[in-house]
């Protein structure tokens, strides 16, 4: 049925799609660079966060344990997306799909236990290495 609507080679359609996508991205980058406000000077190089200018220069690296928690959230959030897709097709996959989902959940639980034992989920404690 697809041949009746679009009589084009699938490879050519993919190439056209990739070329158009790359062209749109390039056009957006060029327009953004052309329209941005061009400022120079000492004030333009000062970091700006929340409307408050920094009182003193930053001394040393910033301890950011929330980055690790955010990365773990993204990893385990993907679990929910994959399991949702499995749940939609659960009747079609049968027992084999159930076993595969159980193995997937088991591997993620092992990863969670490892991260917990490693101290990756402790906010204020120093992680063991």
Curated annotation (Swiss-Prot):
<comment type="function">
    <text>NDH-1 shuttles electrons from NADH, via FMN and iron-sulfur (Fe-S) centers, to quinones in the respiratory chain. The immediate electron acceptor for the enzyme in this species is believed to be ubiquinone. Couples the redox reaction to proton translocation (for every two electrons transferred, four hydrogen ions are translocated across the cytoplasmic membrane), and thus conserves the redox energy in a proton gradient.</text>
</comment>
<keyword id="KW-0520">NAD</keyword>
<dbReference type="GO" id="GO:0005886">
    <property type="term" value="C:plasma membrane"/>
</dbReference>
<dbReference type="Pfam" id="PF00507">
    <property type="entry name" value="Oxidored_q4"/>
</dbReference>
<keyword id="KW-1003">Cell membrane</keyword>
<comment type="subunit">
    <text>NDH-1 is composed of 14 different subunits. Subunits NuoA, H, J, K, L, M, N constitute the membrane sector of the complex.</text>
</comment>
<dbReference type="GO" id="GO:0048038">
    <property type="term" value="F:quinone binding"/>
</dbReference>
<keyword id="KW-0812">Transmembrane</keyword>
<feature type="transmembrane region" description="Helical">
    <location>
        <begin position="95"/>
        <end position="115"/>
    </location>
</feature>
<keyword id="KW-0874">Quinone</keyword>
<protein>
    <recommendedName>
        <fullName>NADH-quinone oxidoreductase subunit A</fullName>
        <ecNumber>7.1.1.-</ecNumber>
    </recommendedName>
</protein>
<dbReference type="GO" id="GO:0008137">
    <property type="term" value="F:NADH dehydrogenase (ubiquinone) activity"/>
</dbReference>
<keyword id="KW-1133">Transmembrane helix</keyword>
<keyword id="KW-1278">Translocase</keyword>
<dbReference type="GO" id="GO:0050136">
    <property type="term" value="F:NADH:ubiquinone reductase (non-electrogenic) activity"/>
</dbReference>
<dbReference type="InterPro" id="IPR023043">
    <property type="entry name" value="NAD(P)H_OxRDtase_bac/plastid"/>
</dbReference>
<keyword id="KW-0830">Ubiquinone</keyword>
<dbReference type="InterPro" id="IPR000440">
    <property type="entry name" value="NADH_UbQ/plastoQ_OxRdtase_su3"/>
</dbReference>
<dbReference type="InterPro" id="IPR038430">
    <property type="entry name" value="NDAH_ubi_oxred_su3_sf"/>
</dbReference>
<feature type="transmembrane region" description="Helical">
    <location>
        <begin position="14"/>
        <end position="34"/>
    </location>
</feature>
<dbReference type="GO" id="GO:0030964">
    <property type="term" value="C:NADH dehydrogenase complex"/>
</dbReference>
<keyword id="KW-0813">Transport</keyword>
<comment type="similarity">
    <text>Belongs to the complex I subunit 3 family.</text>
</comment>
<keyword id="KW-0472">Membrane</keyword>
<keyword id="KW-0997">Cell inner membrane</keyword>
<feature type="transmembrane region" description="Helical">
    <location>
        <begin position="67"/>
        <end position="87"/>
    </location>
</feature>
């Amino acid at each position: 049925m697809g041949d009746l609507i679009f009589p084009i080679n699938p490879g050519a359609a993919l190439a056209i799609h990739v070329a158009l996508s790359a062209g749109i991205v390039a056009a957006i980058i060029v327009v953004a660079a052309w329209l941005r406000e061009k400022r120079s000077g000492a004030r333009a190089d000062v970091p700006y966060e929340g409307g408050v200018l920094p009182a003193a220069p930053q001394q040393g690296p910033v301890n950011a344990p929330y980055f690790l928690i955010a990365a773990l959230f993204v990893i385990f959030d993907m679990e929910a997306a994959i399991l949702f897709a499995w749940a939609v097709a659960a009747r079609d996959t049968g027992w084999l799909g159930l076993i595969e989902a159980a193995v997937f959940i088991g591997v993620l639980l092992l990863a969670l236990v490892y991260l917990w034992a490693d101290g990756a989920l402790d906010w204020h404690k120093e992680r063991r290495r």
